[in-house]
């Protein structure tokens, strides 16, 4: 555990981490609503676009696995600054890419660095913030998703609509430069974990992967990701495809509206859900949110022909529920490993999550089809798979063990049941 921070210093740390996550999320999320432009510019099929989206996650999965061998061997501050600088350069490369192949290569590079960044941010929260406040802390960091959907993605789409798809990535690089300077000023040295490590990196990986509890946590992560990313990457393609043939849907100019509304809603609900998690318990809140999420999952894949005034409330509820289940979900995962192995565990978990996201996005592209007029069909199959994953996650969470709870009980780690 790093030395205790004052409330003010902890707040600035969490806001800085949220800023890093903001750029990471925008870099990933902006690809999905840019789908109609990218498929037109490069002549891509839905499956090829799915591969472009999933390339980021597959690269992040591989780099996350490799990070497990070094993430606990460096000061967290220095590692985050180095990775963030490289991530910014990869984002700039996306903006300068002239061809599909070069864009694919740049997305892979962004995934290599961005995937480890996400893991590192979660690890720092787990190291710095005490267990009893971790739900609220995770909610602060996860407001990055809300701000990304409220400001980042709509701003990126505005730039793309008024110039071209390259401009959002170049602008995001500029934001990264500013945040890198801020992180260098704000982040404290975080090296206490270096004094608790015994043995080699291989030994720590072995300690993580030989514990059945950790494999259950990895399985839980897979279900979390599949439940979202078999559907999310294709929302824009699906809704705009019906508008093109005059059957409701969304125009390209209306797409930012659903991100703006969804982001504003989650901006207000995330803090409430974080407090609810700390008060009512991580597992009960997760189960309730995961069950409720199945409703907008199914509706989101059927609502396009009804037009924006039906799509907007459904998509807003969708964003709120997806964000709401991730707050307790990530708080649970950061608490399933002892502190000395948390960096290694979270690196491996980040790898598992990224691979699951990539495979889910790729599988989602294979499930949907397009008719002769370009309408996206069979999207309901994606929702059915997502609902199954959500229901399995509700069961799986009860099989996990909350290691940090040993500080609150006399009997060691406890199984996470109601």
Question: At which residue positions do the language-model features occur?
Answer:
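Extracytoplasmic gate region of multi-pass secondary transporters
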Residues: 31-32, 214-259
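C-terminal transmembrane helical hairpin of 12-TM major facilitator-type secondary transporters
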Residues: 283-328
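Helix-breaking motifs and short loop linkers at transmembrane-helix boundaries and internal kinks
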Residues: 43, 75, 96-102, 303-305
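Helix-loop-helix hairpin linking two adjacent transmembrane segments in secondary transporters
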Residues: 140-184
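C-terminal membrane-cytosol helix-exit motif in multi-pass small-molecule transporters
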Residues: 173-193, 396-400
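Juxtamembrane intracellular "pre-TM" segments in multi-pass secondary transporters
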Residues: 2-7, 189-219
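Conserved MFS/SLC helix-loop-helix module at the cytosolic interface between two early adjacent transmembrane helices
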Residues: 62-98
């Amino acid at each position: 555990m790093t030395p205790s921070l004052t409330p003010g210093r902890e707040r600035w740390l969490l806001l800085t981490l949220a800023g890093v996550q903001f750029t990471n999320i925008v870099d990933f999320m902006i690809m999905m609503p840019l789908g109609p432009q990218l498929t037109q510019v490069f002549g891509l099929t839905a499956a090829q676009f799915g591969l472009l989206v999933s390339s980021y996650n597959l690269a992040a999965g591989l780099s996350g696995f490799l990070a497990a061998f070094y993430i606990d061997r460096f000061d967290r501050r220095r590692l985050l600054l180095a990775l963030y600088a490289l991530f910014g350069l990869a984002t700039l490369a996306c903006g300068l890419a002239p061809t599909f192949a070069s864009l694919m290569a740049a997305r892979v590079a962004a995934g290599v660095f961005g995937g480890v960044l996400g893991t590192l941010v979660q690890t720092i929260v787990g190291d710095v913030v005490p267990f009893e406040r971790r739900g609220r802390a995770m909610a602060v960091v996860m407001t990055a998703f809300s701000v990304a959907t409220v400001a980042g993605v709509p701003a990126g789409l505005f730039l793309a609509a008024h110039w071209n798809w390259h401009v959002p990535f170049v602008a995001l690089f500029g934001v990264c430069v500013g945040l890198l300077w801020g992180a260098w000023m704000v982040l404290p040295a975080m090296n206490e974990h270096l004094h608790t490590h015994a043995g080699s990196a291989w030994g720590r990986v072995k300690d993580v992967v030989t514990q059945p509890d950790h494999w259950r946590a990895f399985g839980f992560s897979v279900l979390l990701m599949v439940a979202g990313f078999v559907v999310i990457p294709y929302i824009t393609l699906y809704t705009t495809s019906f508008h093109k043939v005059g059957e409701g849907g969304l125009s390209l100019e209306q797409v930012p509206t659903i991100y703006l509304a969804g982001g504003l809603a989650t901006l207000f609900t995330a803090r409430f859900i974080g407090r609810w998690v700390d008060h009512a318990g991580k597992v009960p809140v997760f189960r309730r949110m995961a069950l409720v999420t199945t409703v907008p999952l199914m509706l989101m894949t059927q609502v396009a022909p009804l037009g924006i005034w039906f799509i907007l409330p459904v998509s807003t509820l969708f964003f709120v529920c997806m964000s709401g289940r991730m707050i307790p979900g990530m708080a649970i995962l950061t608490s399933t490993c002892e502190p000395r192995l948390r960096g290694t565990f979270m690196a491996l978990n980040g790898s598992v999550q990224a691979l699951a996201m990539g495979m889910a996005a790729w599988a989602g592209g294979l499930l949907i089809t397009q008719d002769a007029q370009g309408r996206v069909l069979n999207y309901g199959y994606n929702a059915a798979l997502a609902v199954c994953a959500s229901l399995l996650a509700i069961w799986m969470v009860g099989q996990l063990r909350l290691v940090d709870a040993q500080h609150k009980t006399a009997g060691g780690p406890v199984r996470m049941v109601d």
